[in-house]
A protein has these predicted regions:
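ABC transporter nucleotide-binding domain
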Residues: 174-259
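Conserved ABC ATPase "signature" region
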Residues: 99, 103-127
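Conserved ABC transporter NBD signature motif
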Residues: 59-67, 74-75
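Conserved catalytic motifs of ABC-family nucleotide-binding domains
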Residues: 152
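Catalytic Walker B motif of ABC-type/P-loop ATPase nucleotide-binding domains
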Residues: 156-160
C-alpha cells in the first residue's frame, strides 16, 4: 500500500539556519500520528513543506505517492491542513466559505452532503448562515477545521487545532476526528496538549532542533523512556544532596522523583530517614507521554 506521507531525507536552510536536518518519516494510510516537539523544533517548517508553501533545500516529500513539488496539484488535492492561525475570508458565511473551499478542488453541488456532515459533526449547523466575522474565537476555530475538510481529503494535518479552545469544543472535535480516522482518513496531529497525543495517537514522532529524536508507538515510547514517578509530600524541607539528582519537580511541599527502577524507592526513603525528614504522604504513579517528552527534548 502506498504510504499516506513519505518524507525522504528532507533538509531546509533559511540562510545560515539549518532548520530541518535530514528528516525521514513514513506515515501509513489510516494512521493517527502525533508530531511533537518544542517551539523551534521544525514542526511548522515540515508542515509548510508538506503543504507546498515552501520548498525543501534537499530531499523529497510525497502525499499518497504524489510529489509535493513536482506534482503539487495532485498532492494538495489529497491533503487538508488546519493551520494554527485564525485566517478566514470575512465576506462569506460559513456554508459559502466551505462551498468555495471545496470548489477550489473541483468539488461541486454533489459535495453538499459532505459539507452538511462536517457542519453537524463540528457543531456548526446553526451557524451555517452566519458571517465569519461574527463568529466567536472558538467557532472560528471550528470553521477553519471544517474548511480543511471541505474537499474530503484522505490525509488531514491538524496543527495545534485545540490551542485556546474550551473543553467542550476539544471533546467535540476529537470525537469527530476519531470518527474520520475510523472511516479511513489519515490524521497527523501537532499539539502541546500531550495527553491528547497519548490518548488519540497510535504512533508518535518527537522532534528537536530539526531532527526526529524518537519515532515509535506510544506504548513502546512509554516502556522505553518513561520512568515511574514517586510523589512525596514532605513540606518545606531541604533535600539531601544524595537524591537531588532524581528530583523532577517541586511544588508546595510536594516533591516528584523520577525512578528508573523500583529499588530507588528505598534509596529515596532511606536518605530522607537519615536526614530526619518525615514523609507526610506518598504516591507512586505511572509515567506518561509528558515524561517521555521531557526526557528526550528537555523543558524548552
Amino acid at each position: 500500500m502506498i504510504p499516506a506521507i513519505k518524507i525522504n531525507d528532507i533538509h531546509k536552510y533559511f540562510g545560515g539556519l539549518h532548520a530541518l536536518k535530514g528528516i525521514d518519516l513514513t506515515i501509513e494510510q489510516g494512521e493517527f500520528f502525533a508530531l511533537l516537539g518544542p517551539n523551534g523544533a521544525g514542526k511548522s517548517t515540515l508542515i509548510s513543506i508538506l503543504a507546498g508553501l515552501i520548498k525543501p533545500s534537499a530531499g523529497n516529500v510525497s502525499v499518497m505517492g504524489f510529489d509535493v513539488v513536482n506534482q503539487y496539484q495532485q498532492a494538495r488535492q489529497l491533503l487538508g491542513i488546519v493551520p494554527q492561525e485564525l485566517v478566514f475570508d470575512p465576506f462569506f458565511n460559513v456554508r459559502e466559505m466551505l462551498r468555495f473551499q471545496a470548489g477550489y478542488f473541483g468539488r461541486g453541488p454533489e459535495n453538499d452532503d459532505w459539507v452538511d456532515e462536517i457542519l453537524e459533526g463540528l457543531g456548526l449547523a446553526d451557524k451555517a448562515h452566519t458571517n465569519m466575522r461574527k463568529l466567536s474565537g472558538g467557532m472560528k476555530r471550528r470553521a477553519l477545521i471544517a474548511q480543511a475538510l471541505a474537499h474530503k481529503p484522505p490525509v488531514i494535518v491538524l496543527d495545534e487545532p485545540t490551542a485556546g479552545v474550551d473543553v467542550e469544543l476539544r471533546q467535540m472535535l476529537w470525537e469527530f476526528i476519531k470518527k474520520l480516522n475510523r472511516d479511513g482518513h489519515t490524521i497527523i496531529l501537532t499539539t502541546h496538549y500531550l495527553e491528547e497525543a497519548e490518548t488519540l495517537c497510535s504512533r508518535v514522532g518527537m522532534m528537536k532542533q530539526g531532527e526526529i529524536v524518537a519515532l515509535d508507538s506510544t506504548a513502546n515510547l512509554l516502556n522505553k523512556f518513561a520512568a515511574k514517578k514517586l510523589c512525596l509530600t514532605l513540606g518545606e524541607v531541604a533535600l539531601p544532596a544524595k537524591i537531588k539528582g532524581m528530583l523532577r519537580s517541586q511544588e508546595k511541599g510536594v516533591f516528584t522523583f523520577a525512578l528508573t527502577d523500583m529499588a530507588q524507592i528505598e534509596l529515596v526513603l532511606s536518605a530522607l530517614r537519615t536526614a530526619n525528614i518525615k514523609v507526610i504522604d506518598m504516591q507512586l504513579n505511572e509515567a506518561d507521554l509528558e515524561d517521555v517528552f521531557l526526557s528526550l527534548v528537555g523543558q524548552q
